[in-house]
Amino acid sequence: MSLNPRDVVIVDFGRTPMGRSKGGMHRNTRAETMSAHLISKLLERNPKVDPAEVEDVIWGCVNQTLEQGWNIARMASLMTQIPHTSAAQTVSRLCGSSMSALHTAAQAIQTGNGDVFVIGGVEHMGHVGMMHGVDPNPHLSLYAAKASGMMGLTAEMLGKMHGISREAQDKFGARSHQLAWKATQEGKFKDEIIPMEGYDENGFLKVFDFDETIRPETTVETLAELKPAFNPKGGTVTAGTSSQITDGASCMIVMSAQRAQDLGIQPMAVIRSMAVAGVDPAIMGYGPVPSTNKALKRAGLTIADIDFVELNEAFAAQALPVLKDLKLLDKMDEKVNLHGGAIALGHPFGCSGARISGTLLNVMKQNGGTLGVSTMCVGLGQGITTVFERI
């Protein structure tokens, strides 16, 4: 395919192994250290990329306090081979933060404001809890439903509106673990996981090159035994059908097509379109529907043109209505989250957008796909989507 000089291409992608936030492999590793290790190793893997050419390190992170405060992008960048003459910024769109980081870099490239960017994100939910230091304005309840800030209840609401049964959610949750375990066993994550030192359950230092979050023993029957996590009376959303609380980071090297050509680099993919959209915060999980429809329209495509989709699995009760209204339910086993998703791998907020996008590119490569969509819902009612074409 022919590319325009200012087209945005993905050169490479890597991520850390996903660690459990409670006593997991990353319990003694700080978020900046995790991020810096990932950036350094990805640059080492791409010797044609000169770190001095990096215009900006754009890093997603939601809870920007404690070790994740004071512009963690810059903190991490200073710990890598990227010189201090390159800039760095931290961005937040809650769950969509690192996909927003990608979009910010892409928009800069498209407008001639840089050629080489490092993007990604991190969330160490074991060290910085998701509600640490958060003080929501009580007056928000005058403008949005009081439960809009309680993600599990918004998932309950969306599931009820779309008639999603408890059994359907349990099946989706079990599918995530089974597919993630299958991908692990078959080495499908090998290209994306960059090994990291961490600590096992006995406190011994070792190198991890796998996700410790996957539970291969998960079945529909075991999930059916769990109690509702958010609505004790009549609720259907459980811990087993919700994204796991985990620690992790993800990273991409992004370039203009012209610079990649000049350097003799074969990119993984080109960005065809991007979009964000808002929805009622009470049904925040529905955001991927309008954002994906908008992105597809901008690319001149329909959902039928798309070979593979990565949808962030915030909750099964949220993912299934999205797939239903995107006309993907009957194509799920062929196209959607073929390596599992956040129910098995977890959802470290700042990490997930780049993580699902990179996993999508590997799924496309492994299965011969050409067009792919990565999309996710965002707390307080947003959706964000990227359409990629594999090169």
From Swiss-Prot:
The active site is at 95 (acyl-thioester intermediate), 347 (proton acceptor), 377 (proton acceptor). SUPFAM superfamilies: Thiolase-like. The keyword Lipid metabolism applies. Transmembrane segments: none annotated. GO terms for molecular function: acetyl-CoA C-acyltransferase activity. Its main location: cytoplasm. One of its GO terms (cellular component) is cytoplasm. It catalyses: an acyl-CoA + acetyl-CoA = a 3-oxoacyl-CoA + CoA. It comes from the Bacteria. Pathway: Lipid metabolism; fatty acid beta-oxidation. One of its GO terms (biological process) is phenylacetate catabolic process. InterPro entries: FadA, Thiolase, Thiolase-like, Thiolase-like_sf_Thiolase, Thiolase_acyl_enz_int_AS, Thiolase_C, Thiolase_CS, Thiolase_N. It is found in: Cytoplasm. The keyword Transferase applies. Keywords: Acyltransferase, Cytoplasm, Fatty acid metabolism, Lipid degradation, Lipid metabolism, Transferase. Its EC number is 2.3.1.16. CDD domains: thiolase (cd00751). PROSITE patterns: THIOLASE_1 (PS00098), THIOLASE_2 (PS00737). Disulfide bonds: none annotated. Heterotetramer of two alpha chains (FadB) and two beta chains (FadA). Catalyzes the final step of fatty acid oxidation in which acetyl-CoA is released and the CoA ester of a fatty acid two carbons shorter is formed. Belongs to the thiolase-like superfamily. Thiolase family. HAMAP family: FadA (MF_01620). NCBIfam families: AcCoA-C-Actrans, fadA, PRK08947.1. This is 3-ketoacyl-CoA thiolase. It comes from Pseudomonas aeruginosa (strain ATCC 15692 / DSM 22644 / CIP 104116 / JCM 14847 / LMG 12228 / 1C / PRS 101 / PAO1).
